[in-house]
């Protein structure tokens, strides 16, 4: 699983994570390159990966209120898909963080990161609702030639996978 490095605190789970560090240091950049290389190796060896395309937790579009929206998806996943041609299974995760998280997210990144850890810890041992779509083999997306088009294609598929929850 490619995941925010702040969430890689459990030593038993660390071997299953490929951490992405959002701090703006040379060391973070090196670690991120390494994680991306390992993601490619995993796909080349047929190991399934769980990837969160925007790289961020969805946040309310107004400070503490409003609809929760994804940050723009990066084209990194499209690059992996185009290079390694895996079968892709879209998953939509339901749920929302607390209002306090959304308020903190609009103040400053350090507050957001602190609240991110708090929200994750609160979710341990709880049920996560998700919708799983049909798999997409390389033949289903081989006609797509640009990373941006591939990103948009799978974004639309994930959004279409979402089912209404009461």
Name each model feature, range by range:
Residues 1-30:
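Catalytic core of membrane glycerolipid acyltransferases/transacylases, capturing the structured
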Residues 33-166:
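Non-catalytic C-terminal accessory region of glycerolipid acyltransferases
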């Amino acid at each position: 699983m490619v995941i925010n490095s702040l969430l890689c605190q459990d030593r038993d789970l660390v071997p299953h994570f490929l951490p992405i560090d959002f701090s703006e240091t040379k060391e973070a950049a090196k670690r991120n390159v390494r994680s991306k290389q390992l993601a490619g190796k995993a796909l080349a060896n047929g190991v399934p990966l769980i990837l969160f395309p925007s790289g961020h937790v969805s946040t309310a579009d107004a400070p503490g209120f409003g609809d929760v929206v994804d940050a723009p998806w990066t084209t990194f996943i499209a690059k992996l898909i185009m290079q390694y041609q895996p079968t892709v299974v879209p998953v939509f995760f339901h749920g929302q963080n607390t209002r306090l998280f959304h308020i903190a997210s609009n103040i400053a990144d350090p507050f957001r990161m602190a609240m991110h850890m708090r929200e994750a810890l609160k979710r341990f041992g709880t049920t996560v609702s998700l919708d799983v779509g049909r798999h997409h083999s390389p033949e289903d997306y081989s006609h797509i030639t640009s990373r941006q088009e591939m990103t948009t294609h799978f974004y639309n598929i994930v959004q279409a996978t979402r089912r209404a929850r009461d």
